Amino acid sequence: MAVLLSILSSSFLLLLAASSSSTPRASACERCVRNGKAAYSPSLSPLPPGGGGGCGYGAMAMEMELNGGFLAAGGPRQHRGGLGCGRCFQMRCRNAEVCSNAGVRVVLTDFHRSNSTDFLLGGPAFAGLAKPGMAHKLKKLDALSVEYRRIPCDYKDKNLSILVEEQSKRPNNLVIKFLYQGGQTDILAVDVAQVGSSDWRFMTRVYGPVWSIDRAPNGPLQFRAVVTGGYDGKWVWADREVLPANWQPGQVYDTGARIADVARESCLDCATLDWK
């Protein structure tokens, strides 16, 4: 069973303040609809050649697509140096002749370097933007004017999970990647401890969903994380063993916790539009 605490320690408040000061003000109003550009990328794939994509999900991106939405690559403003990895967006294009009103849900799993295009979309996502029979016309356009907003991720029956990265080496060198982070929140801090111990040790963010520690405790491990967004935050952890003592690189472990929170925002009223 997952345990959620809303009591914020003084150390967490310092972390939150530091995070807020380094985050662009606009990110606090993520429920607002924004205008941008999206382009078609025939090469965008759940299994990008030569690696795991700009977020490093690799083959797990295919699972995220099946459970969360179509795959998308985000530009610098969306990717945010990896902090945007795994975020979910609702998007529709603005050409009334060929674009559907409902649009599509996408999951950010890759990065592209252009500042002129906010998103690159693969074939399925691009086709989903179009009215029936109009996808071929959309693909002929260089870039589409789109409306988009961040929305809560919903991975259906998936709990927050941990992928032990291949570069990990037992017992002390541990690198993990979070998968299936639901809701509309960000992970700000991660601690690890041996099951039954109160000796929590902090992990360091490598980028986006990847965290590491070179002095991981021995034995079966438990985790806790500060999940925050806007001005709201809480500790989240599973009150059970997450990684066994003989954890293996390349394996995925279920934390048993599920995040469904939508962090409150301090921004002023903004356009939300009707997305029916």
Curated annotation (Swiss-Prot):
Q: Which residues, if any, are the signal sequence? A: 1-28
Taken from the UniProt entry, a GO cellular component term is: extracellular region
Pfam families in the record, alphabetically? Expansin_C
Q: What is its main location?
A: secreted
Start and end residues of each Expansin-like CBD domain: 172-255
Q: Which residues are glycosylated?
A: 115, 159
Q: Which GO terms describe its biological process?
A: plant-type cell wall loosening
Q: Which SUPFAM superfamilies match?
A: Barwin-like endoglucanases (SSF50685), PHL pollen allergen (SSF49590)
Which Gene3D superfamilies does the annotation name?
Answer: Expansin, cellulose-binding-like domain (2.60.40.760), RlpA-like domain (2.40.40.10)
Keyword Ribonucleoprotein present in the record's keywords: the answer is no
Keyword Glycoprotein on entry: yes
Induction and repression of expression: By gibberellin (GA3).
Recorded superkingdom: Eukaryota
According to its UniProt record, where is this protein located? Answer: Secreted
| Domain Expansin-like EG45: from-to ranges | 52-158
Keywords, in A-Z order: Glycoprotein, Secreted, Signal
Name the family. Answer: Belongs to the expansin family. Expansin-like A subfamily.
Q: What is this protein called?
A: Expansin-like A3
